[in-house]
């Protein structure tokens, strides 16, 4: 099976985060056909191992592709469109898995390298706590000297043939924020007997908005206050997100939010319950590894692009906290729709480029 057919099969049969049972079975079957040693990991993931013929097997490169889909009804109209109602590969994870499959296929056939390659088909990137965190809880890399963890992501802001890199800090951490504000409700015309949770919520949102900067984002996207035109509700809930570009800043912003909550309670004489649901850490690329990958991209004739830090988040950040890591972006065309929408359809022509670059990068790391 070639990588295009592999991608089309996954695209046709998408599965949500941590429900990738048929996806994992399909990947396992293809690996077994090639004689590639592999095992389940993190519930619905697959970890494959290919050993080089040159020895030094404890030295290792981990190649990672996520495999989960999104709860979106597909509207692309292609003949390999999703057959799973309301579920779609709208973030390119079908492409990621197909390219990694192609790399594994080539490595298994040739095996002319030093060390070991671990190919990780990872579940659950799209949903907290993130499949990466579950993978690491199983300690699958502990017996190896991990030289690098490599991941790539399709990018509709770049053309096919372009590969984008950002040395150092690349993607933000993400945490969900949930506020419950309790006051005393009552008639809107009797203000003296009311402790207004709506006003407190408005003040809270304005104060949170003041935390925004180039390195930190705090946003509230949902507010629920079940009052009426003349009735002030007792409770208001607010839900939002917090993103930061370092773990130190992440903790500092959490502390600042806690202080704001206390000030709102005192100022408005209400109770505010804050629940922070921790998400993914920052993605921070290894500097040397990134520069070497950029040189390789140039040498292979690709258009190497410099990327800026972005406030999107990725559970790949868990790997970057522990190992030298690189997460880069692969151009798939600018006219393919936007990620996380019903019409997103990366160009198949990008698959061979993504496979080739990841393959060459793995070999360059292991054989140097």
Enumerate the predicted regions with their spans.
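Acidic/His- and Gly-rich active-site-bordering loop/insert found
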Residues: 1-89, 98-101, 105-113
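N-terminal hydrophobic/helix-forming segments and targeting peptides
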Residues: 1-14, 25, 35, 109, ...
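Non-cysteine beta-strand/loop elements that form the S-adenosyl-L-methionine
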Residues: 62-64, 73, 177, 327-333
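Short, small-residue-enriched loops and turns at beta-alpha junctions
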Residues: 13-18, 69-71, 127, 226-229, ...
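Histidine/acidic-residue-rich, glycine-tolerant segments that coordinate divalent metal ions
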Residues: 70-72, 77-88, 94-95, 107, ...
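Divalent metal-coordination and catalytic microenvironments
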Residues: 10, 63, 93, 119, ...
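Metal-dependent amide/peptide-bond hydrolase catalytic core
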Residues: 199-368
């Amino acid at each position: 099976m070639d990588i295009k057919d592999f991608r089309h099969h996954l695209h046709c049969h998408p599965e949500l985060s941590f429900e990738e049972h048929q996806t994992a079975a399909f990947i396992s079957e293809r690996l077994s056909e090639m004689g590639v040693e592999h095992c389940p990991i993190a519930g619905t993931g697959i970890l494959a191992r290919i050993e080089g013929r040159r020895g030094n097997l404890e030295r290792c490169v981990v190649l990672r592709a996520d495999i989960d889909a999104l709860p979106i009804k597909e509207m692309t109209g292609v003949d390999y469109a999703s057959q799973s109602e309301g579920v779609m590969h709208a973030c390119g994870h079908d492409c990621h898995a197909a390219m990694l499959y192609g790399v594994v296929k080539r490595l298994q056939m040739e095996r002319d390298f030093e060390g070991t390659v671990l190919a990780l088909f990872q579940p659950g990137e799209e949903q907290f706590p993130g499949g990466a965190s579950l993978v690491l809880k199983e300690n699958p890399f502990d017996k190896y000297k991990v030289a690098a963890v490599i991941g790539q992501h399709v990018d509709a802001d770049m053309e096919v043939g372009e590969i984008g890199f950002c040395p150092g800090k690349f993607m933000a951490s993400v945490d969900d924020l949930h506020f419950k504000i309790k006051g005393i409700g009552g008639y809107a015309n009797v203000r003296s007997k009311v402790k207004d949770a709506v006003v407190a919520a408005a003040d809270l949102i304005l104060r949170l908005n003041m935390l925004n900067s180039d390195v930190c984002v705090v946003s509230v996207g949902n507010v629920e206050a079940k009052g009426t035109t003349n009735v002030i509700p007792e409770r208001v809930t607010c839900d939002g997100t917090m993103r930061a570009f370092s773990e130190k800043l992440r903790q500092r912003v959490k502390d600042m939010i806690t202080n704001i909550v206390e000030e709102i309670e005192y100022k408005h004489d209400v109770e505010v319950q804050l629940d922070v649901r921790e998400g993914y850490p920052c993605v921070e690329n290894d500097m040397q590894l990134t520069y070497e990958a950029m040189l390789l991209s140039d040498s292979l004739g690709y258009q190497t692009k410099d990327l800026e830090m972005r406030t999107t988040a990725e559970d790949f950040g868990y790997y970057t906290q522990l190992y030298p890591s690189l997460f880069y972006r692969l151009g798939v065309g600018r006219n393919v729709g936007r990620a996380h929408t019903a019409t997103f359809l990366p160009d198949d022509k990008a698959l061979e480029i993504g496979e080739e670059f990841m393959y060459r990068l793995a070999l360059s790391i292991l054989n140097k």
